[in-house]
Amino acid sequence: MAVLKGTLDLLVLKTLSWGPRHAFEITSWLEDRSGGRLECDDSALIQALHRMEAKGLNAAEWGVTENDRQARYYRMTPSGLAWLRGQGDELARDIAAIGAVLALKTGK
């Protein structure tokens, strides 16, 4: 399934909380950790990375991949960590509330 609308920035920052990564590594990390359930569109990911960089939530620098290719590596900034903590907690509460409703017996 595609990443749910409004969650991409949060998921990308969660990925970057585990260390700097280039775009392909971010996509792979999300797919691996979600058991293949989350798929991230490449163009949406790049737009999100640039948007978050403009907000100071991440920073980027050029590096070399394990295949000797140039790639932009993204890392989370302290502002990004603060944003992740606040938004992550809020989303976790929202998911728990939705889960509580869905766990109810179906009427009629």
Regions found by a protein language model. Give the residues of each.
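N-terminal helix-turn-helix DNA-binding core of bacterial DNA-binding proteins
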Residues: 1-44
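Amphipathic alpha-helical dimerization/coiled-coil segments
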Residues: 82-108
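A cross-family signal for key residues in well-ordered alpha-helices
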Residues: 14, 28, 47, 85, ...
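Beta-hairpin "wing" of winged helix-turn-helix
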Residues: 53-70, 75
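Accessory beta->alpha helical hairpin/"wing" motif in late/C-terminal subdomains of nucleic-acid enzymes
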Residues: 76-80
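Basic amphipathic alpha-helical segments that dock to polyanions
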Residues: 45-52
